[in-house]
Amino acid sequence: MTENKCPVTGKMGKATAGSGTTNKDWWPNQLNLNILHQNSQLSNPMSKDFNYAEEFKKLDFQALKVDLYMLMTDSQIWWPADYGNYGPLFIRMAWHSAGTYRVGDGRGGGSLGLQRFAPLNSWPDNINLDKARRLLWPIKKKYGNKISWADLLILTGNCALESMGLKTLGFGGGRVDVWEPQEDIYWGSEKEWLGDEREKGDKELENPLAAVQMGLIYVNPEGPNGNPDPLGSAHDVRETFARMAMNDEETVALIAGGHTFGKCHGAASPSYVGPAPEAAPIEEQGLGWKNTYGSGNGDDTIGSGLEGAWKANPTKWTMGYLKTLFKYDWELVKSPAGAYQWLAKNVDEEDMVIDAEDSTKKHRPMMTTADLGLRYDPIYEPIARNYLKNPEKFAHDFASAWFKLTHRDMGPISRYLGPEVPKESFIWQDPIPLVKHKLITKKDITHIKKKILDSGLSISDLVATAWASASTFRGSDKRGGANGGRIRLEPQKNWEVNEPKKLNNVLNTLKQIKENFNSSHSKDKKVSLADIIILGGCVGIEQAAKRAGYNINVPFIPGRTDAIQEQTDVKSFAVLEPKEDGFRNYLKTKYVVKPEDMLIDRAQLLTLTAPEMTVLIGGMRVLNCNYNKSKDGVFTNRPECLTNDFFVNLLDMNTVWKPKSEDKDRFEGFDRETGELKWTATRVDLIFGSNSQLRAIAEVYACDDNKEKFIQDFIFAWNKIMNADRFEIK
């Protein structure tokens, strides 16, 4: 075989598979369907039948914790521990793993082990956490498949806290590693690290972001955009922590508790620091930020640029942080690295901080601008002073907030694994009552289905209600879904997308069926309204398929229970309200983001693939499930009949589409020959004929020999959504 040389220059070509100008380069606004096909088995080194939960059960949990405790003080020559203790470093590692979570879309957080991959492994705020993970490698190697990286990062943070004197609330395992960066997470649009193009108006942060600058976990420790303004910093802190689902008390507890330990590193100019892991030379083997100042570690370490510890005894749980914060006046200085920070004035000997490497040296305590926000902000200050007066409350509240921080993205407590799962449940976990009764049998299901069929509710009412109940699910943080029946509670029952008046009528009818069944059976057998809502959707689809000439059975698994209002945090659930739902052709208002992009975003949160999303859209349209009974996209003359008409008519070349509005958000389809108006549509409808990938899928379902395939695929995708939150049956 001859080498691939240029016949003119004789030089080798540079092209390799996957290189060259991409479609995204040519068409930057192209619909990104890749986010619907992440984490396939092709990128996963584990076998298809690998079950992490089963492997975790084999873990010697206590032996692992002993090894982690020992690691805390096992200082390594290649990265010496500050004060001889890695605990503070591991707390930061765990915090920064979990702290990327944002409540707006449920993405980020520690449940996937994303800190191992770009961009997080190379964020400026994560400088030197590559060393923390590398210190953990011998333990990960020892326990192997029995503990995921995602679980290990969080558990190590717990052990660090415990080893330094804090009683934690517990630990729940069950975080399953992914094996590639996640493309669905929007980290911002800035092209430079620490860029801040995400705020508008009165420092209103762009949704769903929860950090003020690109590459930060929360806020700039020097102050807003590096301006040492404590009150301005407190504003940023409040905004970012709220977007992580933390209130003011939890925020103060987390900051004060976290800064009880360890120190910041800014020994010299950042110019001594090399590239982050993703850009580091191959010989560095995944480590980054190589420091050429002095020894490159220990007292010569360069990290955030700030330098020093917050209090004396930085490896012990004490009240020293709050005591120091309020005891002293503070002077603004610049660290050796040139970063703004604050040093205590006239420090008593007992509050001086021993050097991290040389015990003969002492330093004044330091505070960041964000720390001083806790002292001077009118809301944070009394909370912090109250904690100073009540050490037990402070320890309890920090432990509670830490547990929430590290478990917020794991979903219901039923997913937690291990011997340290707290018995107590918390409202932020969206608790659902346990099943304490016999479940309905196949015979009962047949009986209830007949009652639903005879109730007078339409096919579209039944299907739309089931969809409204189940489609709140988010695969990101495992929240939402049909279990709990919260569609009948605040705030969901009054969401605009759910058409409250119509919803109330449907729920009242289904509730009566539930009550009649339960009252006519023994107390140990019951059916929940949550189950009946989903069963109603099954009935609707079966009837629609029957009208199309197919007798099919939609799978149904009972076992859902009904939560009560007291178990439902209205403010917390408000973030689940759909601002758009392309499956119901709903858009609350006009947005900068195109409706078709919002559809892809929602489909990804629902864990749908592109074919599943496509078949669901086609089915929901012909089932007449649009918001407010809109006719947009209902490309059929036989609504509530489960046919492939949506695809057949969308791809019909006898239809000419024209924008109905200047902004091209609605369209009209005219007969090419007669000019007669045939259909109306939204961008969400027409994207399935416009986008080349989606059109290819739509063509499959429009084929004459795929009518039954369409029905079967629709039922499969439908069932996936109806059971998305049924972790106990997976």
From Swiss-Prot:
GO cellular component: cytosol
Catalytic residues as annotated in Swiss-Prot or TrEMBL: H96
SS bonds (residue pairs): none
PTM field: Formation of the three residue Trp-Tyr-Met cross-link is important for the catalase, but not the peroxidase activity of the enzyme.
Main EC class the enzyme belongs to: oxidoreductase
Entry GO MF terms: catalase activity; heme binding; metal ion binding
Cross-link (Tryptophyl-tyrosyl-methioninium (Trp-Tyr) (with M-244)): W95-Y218
Reactions it catalyzes: H2O2 + AH2 = A + 2 H2O; 2 H2O2 = O2 + 2 H2O
Binding-site residues, heme b: H259
EC number(s) stated in the UniProt entry for this protein: 1.11.1.21
Cofactor dependence: heme b
Covalent link Tryptophyl-tyrosyl-methioninium (Tyr-Met) (with W-95), residues: Y218-M244
UniProtKB keywords: Heme, Hydrogen peroxide, Iron, Metal-binding, Oxidoreductase, Peroxidase
Pfam family, one: peroxidase
Similarity-based family: Belongs to the peroxidase family. Peroxidase/catalase subfamily.
Annotated HAMAP family: Catal_peroxid
Quaternary structure, from the entry: Homodimer or homotetramer.
NCBIfam families: cat_per_HPI, PRK15061.1
Function summary: Bifunctional enzyme with both catalase and broad-spectrum peroxidase activity.
Protein's name in the database: Catalase-peroxidase
Species this protein is from: Clostridium botulinum (strain Eklund 17B / Type B)
Taxonomic path: Bacteria, Bacillati, Bacillota, Clostridia, Eubacteriales
Name of the gene encoding the protein in the UniProt record: katG
